[in-house]
Amino acid sequence: TWLGCQEEALKYNDTCTLLGGDGPANPHTQYSAIEQARASKLYSAFAISVTKSEFIVDALSGIDTPVVTFDSPFSEGVSDASQGYIGPDNQAIGADLAKIAQTFLPQGGSLCIFTAIHDPNLRQRVAGVRKTLSKSIIHPYDQKLTGEHGWFEGDRCPLNAGDNSRQTMDQMDAFFSEIHADMLISVGHWPIINADLYRKTTYPYRHDLKTRKTHVVVATGKVQSSYTDLLSDQLIHGLVSIDFKEIGRMTYLRMRQAHKGEPIPKVTYTQNYILTLEAQTQK
């Protein structure tokens, strides 16, 4: 996202600065980065990918610098803390993941969702999965599927990735060796971000994947060649791709508009892309 923001900023002789610590998203690190950025008085606008809405909104109390969110917005109760959101329609990402699942299992089946707790954007993706599979726009986002249109979520699901590669692979191994669901829907890229490690972890279960006894569908950012190789080898079965560079580009433009006092849309959605082996074969 930052790369797209910086490339767009350079067109206007401007700079897009990336703040915050390295590693997994952390609300306390984000809170501290916002405090320091405000105190520096160096910035004309802020763009925040929200980690924990009710906590982070306190860091913005009394701010007079324009604020937008990208990728992960504030939750509905505090959405007025930003002037606008730029990024994917997170419920649509979940819906796209669910639609891929439906093409493989039109009568439904057993399901496990892979997510990470606290992130508002991921809650919306999970909601999109459940609403689409249940065929109910009012299905509560935190209510597991219990047979709606043939879909059941296992007792040990959803799984929590925790933005930690070791935990992710431990959870993946447990999914294959103990949970035995028909479908794994990961609302983030954690399982495949290290494709070699994913191959190693799933090696004992490759027959189930290749014969589609078990299906894996993943939301990701830019589609890497290692991901399409996993598709070709039928070790995963579908991807929903988010264009983070475009998010960055649009985020800069909205910050620039807000700084100039121009009105900006409350929501600016970027496009998602669906990729399956069948779609690859048809190209």
Stretch-by-stretch model annotation:
Residues T1-Y12, T17-Y31, V50-S53, H118-R123, ...:
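Extracytoplasmic "Venus flytrap"
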Residues G87, C112-P120, A161:
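Short beta-strand->loop
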Residues G84-L111, Q124, T168-M169, G221-T228, ...:
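Hydrophobic alpha-helical segments within soluble ligand-binding/sensing domains
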Residues E54-A92, Q224-S232:
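Flexible loop/hinge segments that line or gate small-molecule binding clefts
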Residues T15-L42, G147-E178, I192-A195:
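Structural motif
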Residues T1-D14, I93-L97, N121-F152, Q167, ...:
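Short, solvent-exposed amphipathic alpha-helices that sit
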Residues K41-V50, P66-D71, C112-T115, I179-H189, ...:
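Periplasmic-binding protein-like
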